[in-house]
């Protein structure tokens, strides 16, 4: 098992049609994860459908319907190796209605490549995805200023886009001077694996060099076990196989685990019989591992996506109510107490009611600006009380940060994002 190299989950984010899937396809090709003959086959198929430049993107968009529509829907996991790490790519969809996939996808990422097309520059989703990455705790970014071939590798335009992106990064607390900006053409392979003659003015790293230079994520093995469930399968002859990513802690064969809240809100316990990753059985699973595990002692209809698996002696927290700090990213009017949008936290999606707005904060100092304001609006940071309409596992961001973040969606868009400060447990 290639577990000898450290593992990094990589999100690829950015506006639609800026070249995310093509970049991922190119990375897989350049690192030998996808054989050349498969790319050839895709190329022929793409040309026959009149989409000649799409062959690299097709590696990721292997769902038939997506190929026809030319967009990425579900989050595709693919793996590739560099000298130093092995990566699982979480290819995050860029279409507006898929931002919630982006939320569950990015919350699994240790680092992200933000793809911004040079001809267009910063678009709505470019901003949204940078905001979300920050809220969801992605601290390592690489910026690919892509489609440089479409602007004849013009340095002036590259610098303009770099400045546009830097402005947004600064606004939310990233330091642009510590982030690599790379002029790329994913389609042509410019500055992906090797330095390109087309950009003699650029002396920085390639995408692969930037990936190798990422810091290894610290594995939160000492925290309690938490595995948010993505899917639950029943496999004949084996039984119940939940699938998810270990966020914190360690899971071993023989562990007694509990899934909360469960369909009926009471939680269900069982025993781990085996654990698989990349179709190979492993003795234990660590944070960052995407696993399927066989559990005995639980009926199949009792657990579902959005439940969280933990050890019986340190169970996941089900919240009756929680206090959170939120940032309103975009809302057409004002948000008042009683507002009930959908909260996306790890793999769960639950409608929650904002019961009280306790205070607004001054974004510069973090201090209280106003106590008990009547409403909050776009751009505001606030402390609020929230009550889920059905049982939801969520943790304090100070205790288990991976499960202490959430995004709020309404009207097909991400309205706000936030972190959990305190919980009234069930």
UniProtKB/Swiss-Prot annotation:
Its EC number is 3.6.5.3. Residues 70-74 are annotated as: G2. It is found in: Cytoplasm. Residues 185-187 are annotated as: G5. Residues 91-94 are annotated as: G3. SUPFAM superfamilies: EF-Tu/eEF-1alpha/eIF2-gamma C-terminal domain (SSF50465), P-loop containing nucleoside triphosphate hydrolases (SSF52540), Translation proteins (SSF50447). Mg(2+) binds at residue 21. InterPro entries: EFTu-like_2, G_TR_CS, GTP-eEF1A_C, P-loop_NTPase, Small_GTP-bd, T_Tr_GTP-bd_dom, TRAFAC_GTPase_members, Transl_B-barrel_sf. Residues 146-149 are annotated as: G4. One of its GO terms (cellular component) is cytoplasm. The keyword Protein biosynthesis applies. Pfam families: GTP-eEF1A_C (PF22594), GTP_EFTU (PF00009), GTP_EFTU_D2 (PF03144). It catalyses: GTP + H2O = GDP + phosphate + H(+). Residues 14-21 are annotated as: G1. GTP binds at residues 14-21, 91-95, 146-149. Residues 5-221 form the tr-type G domain. Belongs to the TRAFAC class translation factor GTPase superfamily. Classic translation factor GTPase family. EF-Tu/EF-1A subfamily. HAMAP family: EF_Tu_A (MF_00118_A). GTP hydrolase that promotes the GTP-dependent binding of aminoacyl-tRNA to the A-site of ribosomes during protein biosynthesis. This is Elongation factor 1-alpha. It comes from Methanocella arvoryzae (strain DSM 22066 / NBRC 105507 / MRE50).
């Amino acid at each position: 098992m290639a577990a000898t190299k450290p593992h990094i989950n990589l999100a690829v984010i950015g506006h639609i049609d800026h070249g995310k899937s093509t970049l991922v396809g190119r990375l897989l090709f350049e690192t030998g994860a996808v054989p050349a003959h498969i790319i050839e086959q895709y190329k022929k198929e793409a040309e026959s459908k009149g989409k000649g430049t799409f062959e690299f993107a097709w590696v990721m968009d292997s769902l038939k319907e997506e190929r026809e529509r030319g967009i990425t829907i579900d989050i595709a996991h693919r793996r590739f190796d560099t000298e130093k790490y092995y990566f699982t790519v979480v290819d995050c969809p860029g279409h507006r209605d898929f931002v919630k996939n982006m939320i569950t996808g990015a919350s699994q990422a240790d680092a992200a490549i933000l793809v911004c097309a040079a001809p267009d520059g910063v678009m709505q989703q470019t901003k949204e995805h940078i905001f979300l990455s920050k809220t969801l705790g992605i601290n390592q970014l690489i910026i690919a200023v892509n489609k440089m071939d479409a602007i004849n590798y013009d340095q002036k335009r590259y610098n303009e886009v770099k400045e546009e992106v830097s402005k947004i990064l600064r606004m939310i607390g990233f330091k642009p001077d510590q982030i690599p900006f790379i002029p790329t053409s994913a389609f042509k392979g410019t500055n992906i694996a090797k330095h390109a003659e087309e950009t003699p003015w650029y002396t920085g790293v390639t995408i692969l060099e930037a990936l190798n230079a990422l810091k290894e994520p610290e594995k939160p093995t000492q925290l309690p076990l938490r595995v948010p469930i993505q899917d639950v399968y029943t496999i004949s002859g084996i039984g119940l196989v939940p699938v998810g990513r270990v966020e914190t802690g360690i899971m071993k064969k023989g562990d007694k685990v509990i899934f909360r809240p469960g369909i009926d809100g009471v939680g269900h316990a069982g025993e781990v019989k085996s654990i698989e990753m990349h179709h190979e059985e492993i003795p234990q699973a660590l944070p960052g591992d995407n696993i399927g595990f066989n559990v005995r002692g639980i009926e199949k209809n009792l657990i579902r996506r959005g439940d969280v698996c933990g050890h019986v002696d340190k169970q996941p927290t089900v919240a009756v109510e929680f206090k959170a700090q939120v940032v309103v990213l975009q809302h057409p009017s004002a948000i008042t107490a009683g507002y009930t949008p959908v909260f996306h936290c790890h793999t769960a999606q639950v409608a929650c009611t904002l019961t009280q707005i306790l205070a607004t904060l001054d974004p510069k100092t973090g201090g209280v600006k106003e106590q008990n304001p009547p409403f909050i609006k776009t751009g505001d940071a606030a402390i609020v009380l929230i009550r889920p309409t059905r049982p939801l596992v969520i943790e304090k961001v100070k205790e288990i940060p991976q499960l202490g973040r959430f995004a709020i969606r309404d009207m097909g868009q991400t309205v706000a994002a936030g972190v959990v400060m305190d919980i009234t447990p069930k």
